Amino acid sequence: MSDNKKPDKAHSGSGGDGDGNRCNLLHRYSLEEILPYLGWLVFAVVTTSFLALQMFIDALYEEQYERDVAWIARQSKRMSSVDEDEDDEDDEDDYYDDEDDDDDAFYDDEDDEEEELENLMDDESEDEAEEEMSVEMGAGAEEMGAGANCACVPGHHLRKNEVKCRMIYFFHDPNFLVSIPVNPKEQMECRCENADEEVAMEEEEEEEEEEEEEEMGNPDGFSP
């Protein structure tokens, strides 16, 4: 009986030794000593997961980048073909624009020549008008100079209080003429008195001529 019970004790003893070893480990290492190892373990796990996530994201970006490059290449080919067509159209447009510019330049030259001819004709007409005006002014100045001293113009009689005055330009290119007296008032009165005397002398001469004609008509001096 005692022999049969020994293995059971041994078995139970072995189990008891295992449980005792575990308890001894817990008692052998304190919690403070285990925490640093746990921290390093957590750090390693986090770092590994972060690197794996980063590699996954990089793979996605590389795939997207390759797609973008392929799309850009296709678009560039299309744009190059479109640009070639546009260049051809631009060349044609430039050709026609050059022809239009040549035509416009030709017509512009003709217009410029016509304008030059019109300007020359206008200048000639203005010169002729200025010459005519200068000739008229010269003639008028001579006539006014001749009558400046209130002398009687041949074939005309000066009325009373009539005074001849010179005409001058008020502006450089006048639109109207302004007459102003040149001589003082006393001289004008004197000249007007002389004009009255001349008129009186002419009347006396006319009366004398009439008397002579009457005498010629009556040579004997008798009235009819």
Swiss-Prot record:
P185A and B result from the expression by tumor P815 of a gene that is silent or expressed at a very low level in most if not all normal cells of adult mice. Expressed in testis and mastocytoma. Residues 76-133, 189-224 are annotated as: Disordered. The keyword Nucleus applies. GO terms for cellular component: nucleus. It is found in: Nucleus. Keywords: Nucleus, Tumor antigen. A motif (Nuclear localization signal) lies at residues 5-9. Residues 82-133, 195-217 have a biased composition (Acidic residues). This is Tumor rejection antigen P815A. The lineage of its organism: Eukaryota, Metazoa, Chordata, Craniata, Vertebrata. The gene is Trap1a.
